[in-house]
Amino acid sequence: MIFLMDRIELGTQSLKEYRNFAEENEEVQATENTDVLVDKLKSTSPSDTLIVTSIQKMSNIKDDAQNKLNPNDIALINAKRLVFIVDECHRSTFGDMMQTIKHTFPKALFFGFTGTPIQGENQKKMSTTATVFGNELHRYSIADGIRDHNVLGFDPYKVLTFKDSDLRKAVALEKAKAYSVDEALADPQKSKVFYKYLNLPMAGGKDALGEEIKGIEDYIPNTQYEGEEHQKAVVEDICENWQTQSRNSKFHAIFATSSIPEAIQYYKRFREAAPWLKVTALFDPNIDNNGKGITKEEGLKEIVEDYNARYGQDFSIPTFAKMKKDIAARLAHKSPYQRIERTPEKQLDLLIVVDQMLTGFDSKWINTLYLDKMLQYENLIQAFSRTNRLFGDDKQFGTIKYYRRPHTMEKNIADAVKEYSGDKPFGLFVDKLDKNVEKLNALYVEIKDLFVSAGIEEFSQIPADMAERKKFADLFQSFNENLEAAKVQGFEWDKPIVIINEDTDEKTELHADFDERTFKVLALRYKELFTPNPDGSENDPDDDVPYAVNSYLTTIDTA
């Protein structure tokens, strides 16, 4: 059985996972190169029956002259019952390498696993995942995983760096061939064109006949988002909200940009605007043979030197692949950085990428994805999913903030969710701040009524009745979970929550019905549920009630 990966880092990650799941009498073999792979495929040893390798090594078997693989060797391997398990099979299964593997091993069975299969709407080379692997055998969608609490939901935000009204006017004036609104309105023909574009939706879509229609953002050139004004606004938004969003840098984030030059520009902007932020960048280190190659090489050299200086490393451009592994381990808190959270100065706050690390990379310490990049379908869901690994109460969801053509991205998100949730998106996105505060107020009323009905004022003690104690434990857990979510979304004590209506720009203030002091009193009462009686006596075992205890909650600061 061959577990087939399409990248080295995915193979390394998967090898560890497979070895963790293997039985005591099973061995999962790695393949350092094509020679080792061939030897293990030819081997009759029981220890060589489970192999993890890359699609590149497997496709090289037939044509790699160094291996001198003759027809007898291929026949020997083909005489075995071969099963290929292709992980992340939405990625590199539509190219020549997969075809080479299938032609080399025509009797093998191929099973593809992916959370984002390529389908009709986003087909590649007029093919879908079903074209390559056959009809779908089973579906467990991302929405199923979220509802089963195997992964977290998402909290997406579109961030506008330009006013919609300004973009509408700019496009309308350009199409009307007018320099000002006065000029456009003075000419009937120009006025007609001006108002036509002024009334277009921001994002394009399809009309009743299924024909594509453009929106305002379709007319915005890429250069609009490559300039200083946009980039500075993005950097400012990330930095201003960093402490809250990262839980004081406990969690890390990935920032995906649209090109390598932009990744370098953003790196420099972050270094200038926020020298306290531990940031680096990761992209293809191969130097281009065009006019931009020098700029890329200079930028890459600066990034590597900064990384070495901050973390005491000795990487270079030729050893950039090793630096990538170090970055991945640092972000995931894996060997040699298993307990890096105890030494924050060694952590990495923000990783800037173009395409890398947006598929397959797993770290529960990633809680936010920033996007100055357009994504669709499988690429969008895969990138979002870097943020939704389970952690604890500090991480209730994965946050997504997108800045480029935000209205179009909002539509892309809706399309991708429909495609990959089985058209059942319920639970995929978490409640926004206003809904969380409404829930908090409702839960607070329930808790308050519980204490009042028990004859207790000002939450001065826990109820004596065990059923009431259990109900309080359940209510407070829900209360705290919603509060943690609200804090990440911007909730602050003693400050009103301002909700802005996207369509009308109307502002509404929403207030919490409780303050920080009240919360700390409730947290203290909750802790008392699990402490000995004041006289030192133990609780009567017959009075024990099976609480849904969350150990994190019992360590809340009540000072």
What is each of the regions a protein language model found here?
Residues 49, 201-353, 511-514, 518-533, ...:
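Conserved C-terminal RecA-like helicase domain
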Residues 8-35, 272-276:
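Conserved helix-turn-beta segment of the N-terminal RecA-like "Helicase ATP-binding" lobe
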Residues 12, 210, 242-246, 258-287, ...:
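Catalytic cores and motor modules of nucleic-acid processing enzymes
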Residues 386-418:
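Conserved segment of the helicase C-terminal RecA-like domain
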Residues 50-86, 91-100, 334, 353-355:
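Conserved RecA-like ASCE ATPase "motif II neighborhood" in helicase/translocase motors
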Residues 123-250, 267-272:
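Interdomain helical connector at the RecA1-RecA2 junction of SF1/SF2 helicase-like NTPases
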Residues 20-66:
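Inter-Walker segment of RecA-like/P-loop motor cores
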Residues 1-20, 257-263:
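Conserved Walker A/P-loop ATP-binding site and its immediately adjacent core
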